């Protein structure tokens, strides 16, 4: 059994134990070789996550056409054109100016993209994401009106290994942001949350997308 098959089996079992649907597994292929990516592709994986726009472009041009590409890194204004060209999902929107530029590039390309708003739930200075509710609402309302960017939910990068009380707080925050999205017309929200280190906790509090890299690929280049 390969590392990918082992982890996927563990993920399915963990979701089943919790009475949850199996989340979408995003194979984080940052700094992973095309050879390794082809191996997990042959085992059925189709969703790949990249942190860097140029690496996304290079790999999207070389992997099979039916791969689905998730941009999960911090958004840089000068890389938005590349993201618009190659990504099917963007998990890390948190800036109105970036949204406007992305929309302009998508119009030129006649493409659409699925989007998640990144929330900096622990207000960490080292991480991107929205920290204020009013900024979240403003951005969400802009995205809901877009005909090129489909708002699908939220992404979080919380600190690992939270206590039970911290997990309860995080679950309450997820519920609050989902309610805000529902109130402006975004239903069936996706929650991009959890890695190989904390996916069980993430599943428990509602994650629908898990991002995993070395656990299924091995060490990066």
Language-model features: locations:
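Gly/Pro- and small hydrophobic-enriched strand-loop and loop-to-helix capping segments
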Residues: 91, 207-221
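Conserved alpha/beta-domain cores
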Residues: 1-197, 203-205
């Amino acid at each position: 059994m390969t590392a990918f098959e082992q982890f996927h089996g563990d993920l399915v079992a963990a979701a089943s134990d919790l009475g949850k649907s199996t989340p979408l597994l995003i194979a984080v292929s940052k700094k992973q070789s095309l050879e390794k990516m082809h191996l997990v592709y042959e085992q059925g994986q189709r969703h790949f996550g990249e942190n860097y726009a140029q690496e996304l472009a290079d790999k999207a041009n070389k992997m099979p056409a039916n791969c689905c590409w998730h941009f999960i890194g911090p958004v840089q204004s000068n890389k938005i054109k590349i993201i618009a060209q190659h990504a099917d999902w963007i998990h890390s929107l948190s800036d109105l100016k970036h949204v406007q530029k992305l929309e302009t590039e998508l119009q030129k390309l006649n493409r659409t993209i699925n989007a998640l708003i990144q929330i900096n739930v622990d207000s960490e200075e080292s991480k991107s994401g929205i920290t204020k509710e009013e900024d979240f609402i403003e951005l969400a309302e802009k995205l809901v009106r877009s005909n090129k960017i489909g708002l699908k939910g939220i992404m979080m990068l919380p600190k690992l290994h939270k206590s039970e009380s911290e997990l309860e707080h995080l679950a309450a925050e997820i519920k609050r942001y989902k309610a805000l999205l529902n109130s402006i017309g975004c239903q069936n929200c996706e929650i991009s949350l959890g890695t190989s280190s904390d996916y069980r906790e993430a599943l428990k509090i509602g994650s629908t997308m898990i991002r995993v890299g070395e656990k299924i690929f091995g060490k990066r280049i």
